[in-house]
């Protein structure tokens, strides 16, 4: 392949994730994005939770029952001249770790806001995460077919609470039953709303010009007058779109629409492919790696167990950073120093998998994993480097787990270790007892683990409360002091799923006193994978 062909493939890629509060319409938008990219012909509506048409990206048993996305799926689809990789992140408020790691693998995010509610708690948390890497953000104000808050007010709230400037690209005409469409500020065109449900994309009627009498006839004189008045205000009070400010994460273009009504999503996608960055450089332990480099490199940001109930398998999701993956190529797994031939990498269309012949920077490929790959692993064509910035968080909630059938201890341990490797939960094995303690960032993770142990490993487990309030990973360069610490604190020490030593504290007071007593020991709240 010639360098110019390779450069063209790289420049076509856009890799993004959707962030939102639960129920802001993220799953619907995911489907409609795929629909506009023609990847799904029938966008199975999520509201029909009793029907068999589950949302294309919610494919695990518990997700199917609840209608929330618990695991990250990956979908690739063509749009205009580009190839778009969409990473679906869990929408439920609990799943911050998995979501966080997914956000390390994208170059851009789409923030979905319920225009009736404005900025909500989960959106704030996710925006904090994107801030750490200055990820560019596009915004979609959703649910315009319902009664919403004043759009100016919602934009002000975004600017105030999320500390990002808003630049409206489209502007709504009415809302709820009176929703008539949107006006595009940069094209001077009005797109008239016709509801399109499911997988029908309606032909949209376009009215050119703001002073066109056709506009008054189409939306009514009152709404047309209101639109002109609002636009004067908007153009005076809001920011003009500035591509540099967008790329540095300081400004977000804002689009209005209704995902359920298949309206406005294409305007946002047009903005995404026009403005979002092609695959970005990434920092490694030794240098910055640029997408256009000839040699392949990539990192694993997620491990998913049992994606195919028919095959007991685990798949490691790898973001390609540089070079080109070709079927059958030999790659070095840097952590182990082993060279492996990868002949059966997968690409995904949410649950439908197919084998990949080639992949480029920005693409996500799946590697079959028989317990040898971990989150954070770097693969190269021989270079000894590790991509940085893929963290593990100290859990905030803890339970002791025990079996209904004590003879299944081996299966329980296997299941927990596999679930901890994919980041669904963290497992701690206290050194001084045979207990198994499970740590999570949110309550729902505990339910997920018990449900998956039962459905995937045939193990029935129960939780009991345990006297642990927090955990820290510990290390110390002074061997003698560390031995003394380990001897005296044995009752509070445990090994996590990766056999890293951690201190489990019954109270924050206990942790603070221990830290004061052993100043040479480092207590870490996060750990690089």
From Swiss-Prot:
Domain of life of the source: Bacteria
Sequence ranges assigned to domain tr-type G in this UniProt record: 11-280
Cross-referenced InterPro entries: EF-G-like_DII, EFG_III/V, G_TR_CS, P-loop_NTPase, PrfC, RF3_C, RF3_dom_3_sf, RF3_GTP-bd
One Pfam family per UniProt: GTP_EFTU
Entry keyword Secreted: no
CDD domains: RF3, RF3_II, RF3_III
Entry similarity comment: Belongs to the TRAFAC class translation factor GTPase superfamily. Classic translation factor GTPase family. PrfC subfamily.
Protein name, UniProt field: Peptide chain release factor 3
Organism: Serratia proteamaculans (strain 568)
